[in-house]
């Protein structure tokens, strides 16, 4: 039989020393050790197939149960997986909106939150605040509520994304023009100064009324500034 030439291993992000190594080679410098080979042979890989046709809540619960060890996923990162499985095009539109410059400028979250898909979560909340009949802040299980509601919107398939994108951009253009990066930060009336991190509660309080009356507030920017400041009084 023809002898097959064995290719060397290639490195990974977390195992760079694998580069150029062989499973078993006479040259010890480029070969895995006996102990390393035994460890690999005895290791187990858990594979669970989550069917696209499965109930969405069951999928979310399964992702949560699997979300142990290794790199921990944020609730929004898990939610992204479910949204992609349900409607990839819908996910891409949410993702594109999350990259809008004045949205990012108006919602200055931490680098860690950004890496954990925090901006995309705020876009999800934008839609839920505009379309949901329930009070987001009163939900007993907040993350499950967000997942259920965004999947319900996907199922209904009645969102005019061009119109929503226009309202979204007008909203955050206006917020950044009027409040700079301070619209969702606590306002101190005595010091006439905003400070601290972005407050989710402020976002949930401001967005519904502003988006419903965006044309009015575009013509009445001083009133908008006062309305936002009153949220923190």
Positions of predicted regions on the chain:
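C-terminal subdomains that position terminal phosphate/3'-OH groups for nucleotidyl transfer/ligation
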Residues: 119-233
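Basic- and aromatic-enriched surface patches that contact anionic nucleotides/nucleic acids
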Residues: 2-144, 218
């Amino acid at each position: 039989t023809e002898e097959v030439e064995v290719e060397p291993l290639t490195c990974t992000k977390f195992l760079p020393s694998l580069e150029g190594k062989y499973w078993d080679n006479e040259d010890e410098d480029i070969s895995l050790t006996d102990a390393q080979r035994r460890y690999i042979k005895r290791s187990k890989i858990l594979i669970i197939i989550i069917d696209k046709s499965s109930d969405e809540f069951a999928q979310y619960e399964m992702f949560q149960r699997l979300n142990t060890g290794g790199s921990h996923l944020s609730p929004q990162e898990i939610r992204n997986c479910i949204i992609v499985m349900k409607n990839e095009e819908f996910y891409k539109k949410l993702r594109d909106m999350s990259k809008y410059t004045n949205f990012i400028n108006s919602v200055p979250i931490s680098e860690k939150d950004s890496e954990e898909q925090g901006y995309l979560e705020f876009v999800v909340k934008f839609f839920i605040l505009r379309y949901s009949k329930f009070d987001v802040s009163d939900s007993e299980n907040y993350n499950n509520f967000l997942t259920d509601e965004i999947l319900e919107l996907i199922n209904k398939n009645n969102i005019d994304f061009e119109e929503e994108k226009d309202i979204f951009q007008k909203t955050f253009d206006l917020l950044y023009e009027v409040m700079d990066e301070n619209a969702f930060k606590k306002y101190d009336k005595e010091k006439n100064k905003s400070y601290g991190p972005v407050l989710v509660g402020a976002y949930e309080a401001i967005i519904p009324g502003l988006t419903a009356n965006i044309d009015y507030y575009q013509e009445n920017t001083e009133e908008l500034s006062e309305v936002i400041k009153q949220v923190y009084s």
